[in-house]
């Protein structure tokens, strides 16, 4: 019988952190408490992975890098959402996203650079 070269030789207890879409990832559960620093690149408007990681490791330091998310982005994103919300009574979620961003990144040891 041939040996299956794709079979796993050990078991890893994986956990999904973040959303079920692009913002979430599978990682070994055992490394969460061992991690001191989390570097995140390409944050966008979904920091659910970082938020979930921080919830499981309160001492974690997080540095996020994304050149597309800046003051101008939030200004335009929020103003446009407010305008369309007033006009059409929708896009309220975009406004809430801004406030969630401010709340998460105002925590100690959490930076968006």
Short names for language-model regions:
Residues 1-21:
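Rossmann-like AdoMet
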Residues 14-113:
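SAM cofactor-binding core of SAM-dependent methyltransferases
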